[in-house]
UniProtKB/Swiss-Prot annotation:
SMART domains: YqgFc. Keywords: Cytoplasm, Hydrolase, Nuclease, Ribosome biogenesis. Belongs to the YqgF nuclease family. It comes from Synechococcus sp. (strain JA-2-3B'a(2-13)) (Cyanobacteria bacterium Yellowstone B-Prime). It is found in: Cytoplasm. This is Putative pre-16S rRNA nuclease. One of its GO terms (molecular function) is nuclease activity. Its EC number is 3.1.-.-. Its main location: cytoplasm. It is an enzyme of class 3 (hydrolase). One of its GO terms (cellular component) is cytosol. Coiled coil: none annotated.
Length: 170
């Protein structure tokens, strides 16, 4: 089964919701209406798939999201491991539940980037624990926003990361 999760870049205002789906928590981030900046918004404590999807739907409603961006934790070589397969299952369930484009991006090293961002912001290590998931979601969403902006400005492909669909087949 293959899922098409493309979202065409336009110059229209957007409200993107970014998700970092983990085993215990889902980090949530949102974009500004211009699609320039991603900000961590909060964390969903995972309970069951149906409850998790309902919580995401509530975030979508509150933020009036027009697209959802989900990080897929590919391995260093770009292959799909067990954690990526779990996230792919979540993405398929979310696709059934919401009538919005869902885009996936490779989230490789997003947690490391989030930890670095928090450290650079002067957040003590103990305080980072509660913020890391939402900051990871912000890193994932910012990656997509940057790729989208590059495609809108018609930057040559070699200058942008490109926008791949990592939902794959399971």
């Amino acid at each position: 089964m293959s899922i098409s999760l493309n979202y065409s870049a336009t110059r229209d205002p957007l409200s993107a919701l970014g998700l970092d789906v983990g085993n215990r928590r889902i980090g949530v981030a949102g974009s500004d209406r211009l699609g320039l900046l991603a900000t961590g918004l909060g964390v969903i404590q995972r309970r069951s798939l149906s409850e998790d999807i309902a919580q995401v739907q509530e975030w979508i409603r509150r933020r009036q999201a027009t697209v959802v961006v989900v990080g897929i934790p590919l391995l260093a070589d770009g292959s799909v491991g067990s954690q990526a397969r779990k996230v792919q299952r979540f993405v398929r369930a979310l696709q059934v539940a919401v009538d919005l484009p869902i885009v996936t991006v490779n989230e490789y090293l997003s947690t490391a980037q989030a930890e670095w961002d928090l450290r650079e912001a002067g957040i003590p290590a103990k305080a980072q624990k509660g913020l890391i998931d939402q900051q990871s979601a912000a890193v994932i969403l910012q990656t997509w926003l940057d790729e989208r902006r590059a495609s809108l400005s018609e930057v040559p492909a070699w200058q942008s990361w490109g926008n791949k669909d990592y939902a794959g087949e399971v």
